[in-house]
Regions:
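Amphipathic alpha-helical polymerization modules
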Residues: 2-236
């Protein structure tokens, strides 16, 4: 719920099987605290969030499959669906935390002569053609000049390590497959919102609370049964 308004955020869920295992252990193995405490794992829900209009030509959203690729100062690459970028003085498109947008030929750079010809505005003037254009196919054009092609990749979701809910690091051996423009559409001036559903999250919180209370009652009942057994054993 804390990331309800975070663009591109992907929610994290508990394995339902782990919760069922906890309940079964609590019901069937009284007094066995170790077996009643299995590891609880989580997974990321990569379903798309709603598209939100911003009007900023530096905001990009993906429709369909794939991820944007961004790169940090050490050359490590990350995948994200959050297309919120800012323009640096040397012509790079950066994420809020300083990673640079990657194209099919490496990190994208807008030539300085194109930047100096007409400064980029945060928003285009009404009725004017924006100086920076990203086509639905992922072509980056400035002043009508083709600067580069965004790298949009697909990957098996099990090959990603969650970094912060917005960015994901490929695991060693992960295969990143460049997607063709037929598999996605880039929407300029929009951002993909968080896929957190507040109603569903509240329902899950209530369900987890119910399971916790059930487990607590079972443990108390098991403890009471064990105490009675010990008391009876003293008279044998």
């Amino acid at each position: 719920l804390a990331n309800l308004s975070t663009a591109g955020y992907k929610r994290e869920l508990l394995f339902q099987s782990a919760l069922i295992s906890v309940e079964q252990n609590l019901r069937n193995v009284p007094g066995d605290a170790e077996s009643a405490d299995p590891p609880v794992r989580s997974y990321t829900d990569f379903s798309p969030g709603p598209l939100q209009h911003t009007g900023n030509p530096l905001d990009l959203a993906l429709e369909g499959a794939g991820f944007f690729v961004v790169q940090d100062a050490l050359g490590q690459r990350f995948l994200t669906r959050r297309g919120s970028f800012r323009l640096t003085a040397d012509g790079a498109l950066q994420t809020p935390d300083g990673k640079e947008l990657v194209g099919t030929s490496g990190v994208l750079r807008i030539p300085l002569q194109l930047l100096q010809a007409q400064p980029l505005a945060g928003e285009a003037r009404q009725g004017a053609v924006p100086p920076l254009e990203v086509t639905p196919e992922g072509e980056l054009r400035v002043q009508g000049v083709l600067v580069g092609q965004l790298l949009i990749v697909g990957v098996q979701l099990g090959q990603l390590r969650r970094v912060d809910g917005v960015q994901f690091a490929p695991l060693p051996g992960a295969v990143l497959t460049p997607l063709s423009p037929e598999e996605y559409r880039v929407r300029q001036g929009l951002l993909e919102g968080s896929n957190v559903n507040p109603v569903e999250e509240l329902v899950q919180l209530i369900e987890l609370q119910r399971r916790f209370e059930l487990g607590h009652r079972v443990i108390r009942s098991s403890d009471a049964t064990l105490e009675r057994s010990i008391e009876l054993a003293r008279f044998v």
